[in-house]
UniProtKB/Swiss-Prot annotation:
GO terms for biological process: malate metabolic process; tricarboxylic acid cycle. It is an enzyme of class 1 (oxidoreductase). This is Malate dehydrogenase. The gene is mdh. NAD(+) binds at G12, A13, A14, G15, Q16, I17, A18, N106, Q113, V130, G131, N132. Substrate binds at R93, R99, N132, R163. Catalyzes the reversible oxidation of malate to oxaloacetate.
Amino acid sequence: MAKPAKRVAVTGAAGQIAYSLLFRIANGDLLGKDQPVILQLLDLPQAQGAVKGVVMELDDCAFPLLSGVVITDDPEVAFKDADVALLVGARPRSKGMERKDLLSANAEIFTVQGKALNKVASRDVKVLVVGNPANTNAYIAMKSAPDLPKKNFTAMLRLDHNRALSQLAAKSGKPVASIEKLAVWGNHSPTMYPDFRFATAEGQDLTKLINDDEWNRNTFIPTVGKRGAAIIEARGLSSAASAANAAIDHVRDWVLGTNGKWVTMGIPSDGSYGIPEDIIYGVPVTCENGEYKRVEGLEIDAFSREKMDGTLNELLEEREGVQHLLG
């Protein structure tokens, strides 16, 4: 017997990331090949025509798992009974815009969306914030939804995680799928810290295989941190397909489990690893039965502490910049 359809809300539905994301969700890549979905698409009033065009294309794919589509500019319609909410839409930084202005503009969007989720979404809704600054936007949404469990709110660090995996595979000559126990700590920004001190490839210790501290500090970490900028430089557009792919990975693993493998998610801190409570911070997790669990008890050396504190300080500054908007 067919499963009842799950409702997946996607914001910024007319945008580039959503265009790479929606067809994969409708194809079963997000929640499984036996799980029907209803897409609930949110975008601004002026983008409704473009969303309709995307929905025409979705119709033309005749996806067996796509049970229905809702198009709206009202967050309360988009998030009604949502099982998963992918918050992709955010205010991009325009020329001459200060970072604090960007934070304020996004605080407004994510306060409204957090309140709407609080009011109408499923109490078990899994929220992934993709729109930047993702960690702080997730924090704002979480703080605006006091009736939902904090653990329901996450930010996307999976793109950084996947970027790091690919660099490590290239450097070590090992298949990307063989690399395990990679962690990415902190903010989804150039300050985040990809950490392969615990990683293995085909069961071998990756730090011994690579054995190049200079490469780690001066090539690997900056390459992962600045990859988004490098793609804009090369392509003239920001990374959309790889971001959509990371969003699929993040939610699929959260829902269907990681079989004991580590992945990175931005989650509300419980105070461990010296990260103040409630800060949305990238940490290694495993997922099972629809829940994530942080990997506990990892040793933090002096270099790692410095890196982890650097990215934390950026998050604390961002939080400071939006605190007055949260009431």
